[in-house]
Curated annotation (Swiss-Prot):
GO cellular component, one term: extracellular region
Catalytic activity of the protein: Endohydrolysis of (1->6)-alpha-D-glucosidic linkages in dextran
Taxonomic path: Bacteria, Bacillati, Actinomycetota, Actinomycetes, Micrococcales
InterPro entries: B_solenoid_dext, Dextranase_N-ter, Glyco_hydro_49_C, Glyco_hydro_49_N_dom, IPU_b_solenoid, Pectin_lyas_fold, Pectin_lyase_fold/virulence
UniProt entry tagged with the keyword Glycosyltransferase: no
Compartment(s): Secreted
Class of this enzyme: hydrolase
Family membership noted in the UniProt record: Belongs to the glycosyl hydrolase 49 family.
Protein name as catalogued: Dextranase
Pfam families for the chain: B_solenoid_dext (PF18841), Glyco_hydro_49 (PF03718), Glyco_hydro_49N (PF17433), IPU_b_solenoid (PF18783)
């Protein structure tokens, strides 16, 4: 829906990190077990470092550290602190010097940042993640040549083989070596695109189940009598290997004095950005805090916010004015919403959304822009957005004139509902990104949009790809190389806004079939090379609100269905009407090739073919498309 140090000893901080382990049965991946009725034990106390902390900053490798990092696995951090992972450590070495490894700070996000529900009691989407003790750790570095990345468990759990560690996307097929009982070494080749991947230790795996209660069921970690939904690490560990910027890219994405006047905030409390007179706000390495009752509403002169590697900014930015032709938000730093409550309402003193407000207009968004009738562009590059309290990115105004170039963007710790991915506006491109999201991830609402190389870790709410919610005119969309490494979409009833591909019914009344508009058209959308690792709930649900033509889904591979009944996993292709009863159309795929083309769609390695007898709702393909649309779709296996 619509500061860094070289050769310094880190603080000796002691804190226990809870690690919950369960047994899930022989049909699922091997997992560590806890004796029935026992309480999962906490990890060993984090204490003295194994070695002095050292970081790298040379032409081929750049890592960074926060001397104010603290182990706080269950409670909020102070304004001047950065939560350090109490579960993982990361070190990086150049491939030609594997024994000379440098530390890369490992961040950690916990549900609600440990705050609990402040000022509200209703559901916020973080219930299961909080109750199950989920966390998300991540570490970033810049590199220009091949590297070895060492990832160590701090939990006391051990492995005996590198094969007990899975890298996802699994297509990366990185070389792995066992260093010792808690450390694996991963060879990451250099790529101009970088890599964003999950490191998954077998003892950390758990399975989420649907308890089959009520209409939808609820997620639980209890196996007995329940249905498996997905297996994933309870404490995730993401590595973001980002390319060092050089030449024209560096000139475009890293500000200098030639770029304009620059304001350098001092680390610490930052609550005066509304009146900055410079054109550029440059956050150097360090920790910055806006507090829970402020976000930066920037003046018209500000065109660029830069977060340097090692900058950790607790806050959010609103570009209130629409006067700039070129905006930029760049840098490999972190922008964290951890201090805000869920749906922080600026009309309610930044407390949780009041009944008198509309969150769409008044709640804090991590990045918010206003667009004018004149052409505008945005470069969004490198930034890691952590723990959004609501939408992470919005643009309000003329959506046809705001064009975006998004590169190497990451989103982590999306525990709450409505923590969507990014909506790309007309003429925009996006590549080399990672999204942990708890709502629609890739929002395809506009024409002439191109997306490539996306890694998705999907939470419960919303689909992966969305182009519905209201009638639209969309033409020329290309989405390639999307990998869903995990998802917890679990509903046992048939929701309108879920699955991998989705065009939802109308947001005003999702049960209505009469809110379509035959005067609008969605056409020429191509989705190629979409891989879903592990189990998922459903493939495609299209509730067409517009005339629909030439939708091509090619090389769509699902690992397996979850443990729900086929009736919960069915795909739909439906045509809705307007209030006068006029039904939208879907192009004729057979024989005209102008409808919904599903080429090389497979489940568990078996290709689904319309002519092969494995496509229908109760069969492996789970395609329960309306009979009136028989000629509007085809599923087939193409020649190699």
């Amino acid at each position: 829906m619509p500061g860094t140090g070289l050769g310094r000893l880190a603080k000796h901080v002691t804190a226990a990190a809870a690690v919950f382990l369960i047994s899930t049965g022989a049909v699922l991946p091997a997992q560590a077990e806890t004796a029935p009725g026992s309480t999962p034990s906490a990890a060993p106390a984090a204490s003295v470092e194994k070695h002095p902390i050292t970081t790298a900053n040379n032409g081929n490798l750049h890592t960074w550290w926060h001397d104010n990092g603290v182990f706080s696995p269950a409670a909020p951090t102070q304004s001047d602190e950065v939560r350090r992972s109490s579960l993982y450590d990361v070190r990086v070495a150049q491939a030609n010097q594997p024994q000379k490894a440098y530390d890369a700070f490992t961040y950690m996000s916990i549900p609600r940042s440990g705050k609990g529900k402040i000022g509200y009691t209703e559901e916020d989407g973080a219930e299961f993640s909080s109750e199950a003790g989920l966390t998300m750790s991540w570490s970033s570095f810049e590199y220009a040549k091949d590297v070895w990345v060492e990832v160590s468990l701090r939990t006391g759990q051990t492995i005996s083989s590198a094969d007990q560690v899975q890298i996802r996307p699994s297509s990366y097929n990185f070389e792995k070596q066992l260093v010792d009982a808690d450390t694996v070494r991963i060879k990451v080749p250099y790529s101009d695109a970088g890599y964003r991947f999950s490191v998954e230790f077998e003892p950390q795996l758990y399975t989420a189940y649907n308890d089959m209660s009520g209409d939808s069921g609820k997620l639980t970690t209890e196996a007995e009598g329940n249905r498996p939904i997905h297996t994933e690490p309870r404490n995730s560990m993401m590595v973001f290997a980002e390319p060092k910027l050089r030449g024209e890219q560096k000139e475009r994405l890293v500000p200098t004095q030639e770029s304009g006047s620059i304001h350098y905030p001092e680390p610490g409390e930052v609550r005066n950005l509304n009146s900055v007179s410079a054109e550029i706000i440059y956050f150097r390495p360090g920790t910055y805090s806006m507090g829970s009752d402020y976000h930066a509403v920037l003046p018209a002169n500000v065109k660029w916010v830069y977060l340097a590697p090692g900058a950790y900014v607790k806050g959010a930015f609103r570009f209130l004015h629409d006067t700039q032709s070129q905006y930029k938000v760049t840098g490999y730093g972190v922008l964290s919403g951890e201090q805000y409550v869920y749906e922080a309402d600026t009309n309610n003193s930044y407390n949780h959304l009041s009944g008198a407000s509309n969150c769409h207009s008044s709640c804090v968004k991590m990045l918010q822009f206003a667009s004018a009738d004149a052409e505008q562009k945005l470069d969004l590059q490198g930034v890691t957005v952590a723990e959004p309290p609501y939408h992470s990115f919005v643009v309000y105004g003329n959506e046809q004139t705001f064009h975006m170039n998004v590169e190497n963007y990451k989103q982590v710790g999306s525990w709450y509902w409505q923590t969507d991915g990014i909506e790309l506006y007309q003429g925009s491109t996006m590549k080399n990104t990672f999204f942990n999201a708890n709502d629609d991830v890739l929002k395809m609402y506009h024409s002439d949009v191109s997306i490539d190389n996306t890694v998705v870790w999907k939470n419960e709410n919303g689909p992966v790809v969305q182009w519905g919610w209201t009638p639209r005119n969309i033409d020329n969309v290309n989405v390639t190389n999307t990998t869903v490494i995990h998802n917890r979409m679990y509903w046992k009833d048939v929701k309108y806004n879920t699955c991998i591909f989705n065009s939802s019914s109308h947001w005003e009344d999702m049960g209505s079939t009469t809110k379509a508009d035959p005067n609008t058209t969605v056409k020429n959308m191509r989705f190629e090379n979409t891989t879903v690792e592990g189990m998922t709930n459903c493939a495609i649900r299209v509730y067409a609100l517009s005339d629909t033509e030439n939708i091509h889904i090619k090389n769509f591979n699902i690992g397996s269905w979850n443990g729900l009944d086929w009736t919960s996993q069915v795909s739909h292709l439906k045509r809705y009407t307007n209030s006068a009863g006029e039904k939208v159309t879907i192009g004729n795929e057979l024989p005209d090739g102008n409808g919904l083309a599903i080429e090389n769609y497979s489940v568990g390695g078996q290709v689904i073919e319309k002519s092969g007898g494995n496509w229908s709702d109760y069969q492996l393909g789970r395609l329960g498309f309306d009979g009136e649309n028989w000629d509007s779709w085809n599923a087939w296996k193409s020649a190699p």
